[in-house]
């Protein structure tokens, strides 16, 4: 599972997901990308499930880039515990995703396989996404 090696503070506040993604909105490494259309927290388990799903469709050919990283801890209090008594323990790690962010990129496979792999990965996520190509300007990839 993806998670930071060490963090300065063990627990974080929830924060809010206003607006669109500032960076990471273009396909920069692969030929096809999966773009988020809604804001959400994507867990480390969901990222791993997507990676395995894409590998299965691609039959280990090509290359996958994971453009998000779960660097935010989320906490949860035990079941049936009373309110108060401090913040709960860290339950897992999430990546904060805003609309427009590229989540995964794929290269080295044909268009049909890339679309199928990214669609399969999208089914593992709790948000709406779309498959986008790498932009080419004047014959050169951007």
Swiss-Prot record:
It holds the Pfam family Ribosomal_L16. Keywords: Ribonucleoprotein, Ribosomal protein, RNA-binding, rRNA-binding, tRNA-binding. GO terms for biological process: translation. One of its GO terms (cellular component) is cytosolic large ribosomal subunit. GO terms for molecular function: rRNA binding; structural constituent of ribosome; tRNA binding. It comes from the Bacteria. The keyword Cell division does not apply. Part of the 50S ribosomal subunit. Belongs to the universal ribosomal protein uL16 family. Binds 23S rRNA and is also seen to make contacts with the A and possibly P site tRNAs. This is Large ribosomal subunit protein uL16. It comes from Thermotoga neapolitana (strain ATCC 49049 / DSM 4359 / NBRC 107923 / NS-E).
